[in-house]
Amino acid sequence: MNDLQLQDELWRLVQGFKMTQAIYVVTRLGIPDLLKEGPRSHEELAQETHAHAPSLYRVLRLLTALGLFTEGEAHRFAVTPMGALLQTGVAGSMHNMVLRFGYTDFWQVWGALLYSVQTGQPSWEHVFGLSPWQYRAQNPEAAAVFDAFMAESIANLAPAIVAAYDFSTTSSLVDVGGGRGQLLASILQTYQTLHGVLFDLPHVVAEASPLLERAEVTERCQVIGGDAFKAVPADYETYLLSRVIHDWDDEHAVTLLTRCQQAMQPQGKVLLVEYMILTDRALEVPVLESDVNMLVAMGGKERTDAECCWPGPDALTAGPSTVLPD
């Protein structure tokens, strides 16, 4: 690239926060869903969303240039295939991801990235004076946004996990930190002889029943509330931790894995689903972005294979890994 091209590329990177907020605003207003039945004018959309029509038009025009919408005659807008991913109820929807990453708490925490870089501590508690869990317990709207994002991301990830690992010889599976059970339900639906245990904090699993009932797996799924740092359900064959370990520093990660190791049956195993920093291929921006996100939010991190081997009396060592498709 010449100097002008380099400047253009750097400009694009630095301006990214503006694009995020523009996408967030139209998603928060429900514009993509209003276009499910076909094109509509910005005046119609503004009237339905109680927005200022000229300002909404300017944002839609920007997002049209970014490839999320098309603009026809009389300023009538329609979604493109990429823009359709902002809609609810569609395959691969990223609606709740956008609402999460555009939400005010996420912006405040990333705005304090300098604090984390200078101190090595998560900026979340620096900004709010609370852990993420304490903050969401006191802010129901923020909790709802986060929970919807997690459910959506698990729904998008579950098919790849089910396809990547053969649970046919597994008799029992404990999903540690399994939330409301979306991933476990998907696994149980695929493997009809498998018995599962959903384990998470009591207030989290208290809301799992509707999803498990819709999946028709309640007869093969026990729901247990508790604190995994103290103990996990004992005497099961396999323990699954999906995107749990990356929340924590090495000390806490070892504690969680040790609890599972102590609880599992002889010859049992612990399965981890994590973003991995793969040292044998080009670095992948989404993984590295998630790594920095763990820094500011939780004090955790994404790890390489080698970093998943912790020294200690129980020799916590990573076994073979499987890379899920993009």
Model feature map: region roles:
Residues 4-172:
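Conserved Class I S-adenosyl-L-methionine-dependent methyltransferase catalytic core
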Residues 91-283:
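Conserved adenosyl
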Residues 317-326:
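Conserved S-adenosyl-L-methionine
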Residues 271-314:
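C-terminal alpha-helical "lid/dimerization" subdomain adjacent to the S-adenosyl-L-methionine
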Residues 66, 191, 316-317:
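Short glycine-rich hinge loops at helix-strand junctions in the catalytic core
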